[in-house]
Regions:
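Bacterial N-terminal signal peptides that target proteins for export
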Residues: 1-9
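Sequence context surrounding c-type heme c attachment/ligation sites in exported
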Residues: 20-268
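Bacterial N-terminal signal peptides
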Residues: 9-18
Length: 268
């Protein structure tokens, strides 16, 4: 017997509030040009249980992609209720392919001296449209923090490259005049997946950092936020205003969160 996990109403409210008017993560958190963690993306689906390992079982289950996103498509509930069985089957297959093809890795020197300057680089693959990359001190979705909370200092603006190999500054250029741009979070724009050809966009972000001054072993991970439905030929809906949204809606579960495997850096 299958057990359906229902997202508590309080979580739905958080998702809608964090989404902002009509956009959610559909076009990225464009107004939040600041340090970010995945807690701001309340409507997203989690890819993998490990990022929710400290949460109560019921809450964790409600956030997993299998229950939050796959199941409503498969059963034809919510925003998917008017889709034909054939279209739902295609959308589900396309979304699963997006997840199977998504990846995120993080690299950094294994050993640093206190305060030593170094570079850490995130490489991501997958998603469609705008994707988000946050560097964090753990791989916890709800309790992870920016690396600055663990003593790291980001030196200057992160360097961002999109699928075309060209450097992007759109995200950091959106920072308010006079504000520092040493952010832990970036958006990568114009990423396009071709499901028919099984081609998926890649992106790269490099942060120049100073190591913590306190000796010890530090954990680093990257949270990769990406959309899935808009890459599918049956995965969009057009509003009366002409906006193209995911089939699941702007505050729906089609945005997914994937963490890289954590790495450790020893400061000594």
């Amino acid at each position: 017997m299958r057990h359906r996990f229902v997202v508590p109403s309080a979580l739905v409210l958080v998702a809608l509030l964090s989404a902002g008017p009509g956009q959610a993560y559909n076009g990225g958190p464009m107004r939040n040009v600041t340090d970010l963690t995945p807690t701001c993306a309340g409507c997203h689906s989690s890819v993998g249980k490990e990022q929710l390992r400290l949460e109560p079982d019921t809450l964790a289950a409600s956030m997993l992609v299998e229950n939050r996103h796959y199941e409503p498509i498969e059963e034809g509930t919510g925003p998917y209720k008017d889709m034909s069985p054939a279209d739902r089957q295609k959308l589900l297959a396309d979304v699963k392919l997006m997840d199977q093809s998504a990846s995120a890795t993080l690299s950094a020197p294994p050993t640093l001296k206190p305060g030593q300057e170094a570079q850490i680089t995130a490489t991501v693959r997958g998603g469609h449209g705008v994707v988000g990359v946050w560097v964090m001190e753990s791989d916890l979705r709800l309790q992870g923090r920016p690396i600055s909370a663990d003593g790291w200092f980001i030196v200057g603006a992160p360097k961002v490259w999109g699928a075309d190999g060209k450097e992007q500054t759109k995200w950091v250029d959106g920072r308010g005049a006079g504000l520092k741009k040493n952010l832990n979070a970036v958006l990568i724009f114009d990423q396009k997946a071709d499901l028919a050809a099984r081609k998926f966009p890649e992106g790269k972000v490099t942060w120049t950092v100073q190591a913590p001054h306190a000796p010890g072993t530090y954990t680093l991970a990257v949270a990769f936020h990406y959309g899935t439905e808009k890459a599918s030929s049956v995965g969009t809906v057009t509003t009366v205003a002409g906006a193209i949204l995911p089939k699941g809606g702007p505050g729906g579960p089609s945005g997914h969160i994937l963490f890289s495997k954590p790495i450790t850096v020893t400061v000594r």
